[in-house]
């Protein structure tokens, strides 16, 4: 049974007030709150096992190393990767995409080669490729979307050429909530011999992800959006691909031997993990993933889908309401505008009512241009949100709308 009262008690911040009002936190697409078990696990490691990993023969270092590598195993199991060697720790999704963009372009792309992305991408899956285009002369091709906010896959098929080297696509839109058909995208790309990178920042916290079932070649996500700490993320890569890619950064730990003439590199996954990792954060991430597993990803998905349907129904009763994104497969995100009210004004006034939402372009300016707007208000739901909080949002929007 999904006991929302018990779940909410795991998150102390949810009981606080803002401007004298109960906090209604609906900005989970930006970051999630952290359960006590995560905070306790990280504090316990700092108090009892704080030492650099993989470098010391002393007890604390070995204990910290064991926790760090156990976290890698937890991540591997959570996304059903085949091997711990396929799990690379990063600072987050953005660094993960930059890692693949840099290493893949260096190893496998020539001037004039092409990468395919989509019209709904977050800037973190646009700008890294633009940087590579400026440095290496690669070209970027874009899969368009229809008016429902869904990818036009037939148009994607037309983008493949003999120069296509990679497809890089988000699994879930952080603006529209669209859940993209990753398995079908991967199938079509593989027919052309093209690997696929998936941005899973907005999927991992919300529903079960199985990278072997998706058959994607690379997958990346962030800890802080999955109820874990900031500053830690994951790149999954098929081992055969990671073996072939050159390192992203150089430094300690990612080497086998170093001389002034030559450096040889460590085996996977350490080849991509230069320097001291945030070993306490990896332990926190593993604790968060264990928390999600204990609740059950299917249970979380059902709860959030119910919230999304209910919120959509209630918001649509407000005069002047415009919701952006009407995919038949939609995740826990609703972006909207009301009449001529600027999204910043609406979000600011909702904040005075204790309701935390996101306003602006959500790091997706090309998508906003496609929609013909400058930004939206975004309500994004998490495993601890309730229908009562949706009611508070709807009442708040009505109250603000009445002021204009």
Residue ranges, per PLM feature:
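Pyridoxal 5′-phosphate
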Residues: 1-404
């Amino acid at each position: 049974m999904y006991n929302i009262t018990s779940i909410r008690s795991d998150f102390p911040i949810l009981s606080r007030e803002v401007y004298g009002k109960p906090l209604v936190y609906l900005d989970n697409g930006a970051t999630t709150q952290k359960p006590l078990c995560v905070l306790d696990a990280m504090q316990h490691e700092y108090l009892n096992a704080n030492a650099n990993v993989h470098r010391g023969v002393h007890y604390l270092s070995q204990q910290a190393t064991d926790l760090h590598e156990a976290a890698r195993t937890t991540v591997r199991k959570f996304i059903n990767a085949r091997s711990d060697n396929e799990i690379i720790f990063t600072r987050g999704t953005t660094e993960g995409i930059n890692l693949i963009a840099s290493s893949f372009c260096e190893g496998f792309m020539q001037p004039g080669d092409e990468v395919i992305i989509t019209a709904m991408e977050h800037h973190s899956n646009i700008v890294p490729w633009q940087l590579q285009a400026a440095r290496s002369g690669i070209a970027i091709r874009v899969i368009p979307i229809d008016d429902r906010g869904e990818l036009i896959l037939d148009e994607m098929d037309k983008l493949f050429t003999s120069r296509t080297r990679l497809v890089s696509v988000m699994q879930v839109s952080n603006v529209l909530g669209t859940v993209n058909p990753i398995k079908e995208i991967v199938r079509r790309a593989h027919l052309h011999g093209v690997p696929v990178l998936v941005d899973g920042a907005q999927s991992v916290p919300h529903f079960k992800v199985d990278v072997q079932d998706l058959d994607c070649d690379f997958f990346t996500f962030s800890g802080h959006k999955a109820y874990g700490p900031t500053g830690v993320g994951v790149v999954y890569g098929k081992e055969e691909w990671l073996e072939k890619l050159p390192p992203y950064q150089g430094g300690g730990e990612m080497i086998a031997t170093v001389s002034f003439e030559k450096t040889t590199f460590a085996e996977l996954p350490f080849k991509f993990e230069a320097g001291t990792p945030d070993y306490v954060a990896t332990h926190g991430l593993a604790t968060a993933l264990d928390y999600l597993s204990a609740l059950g990803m299917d249970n979380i998905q059902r709860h959030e889908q119910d919230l999304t349907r209910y919120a959509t129904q209630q918001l649509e009763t407000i005069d002047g309401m415009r919701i952006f994104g009407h995919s038949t497969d939609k995740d826990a995100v609703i972006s909207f505008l009301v009449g001529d009210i600027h999204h910043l004004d609406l979000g600011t006034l909702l904040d005075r009512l204790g309701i935390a939402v996101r306003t602006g372009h959500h790091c997706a300016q090309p998508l906003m241009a496609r929609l013909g707007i400058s930004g939206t208000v975004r309500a994004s739901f998490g495993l601890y949100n309730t229908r009562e909080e949706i009611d508070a949002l709807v009442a708040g929007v009505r109250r603000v709308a009445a002021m204009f």
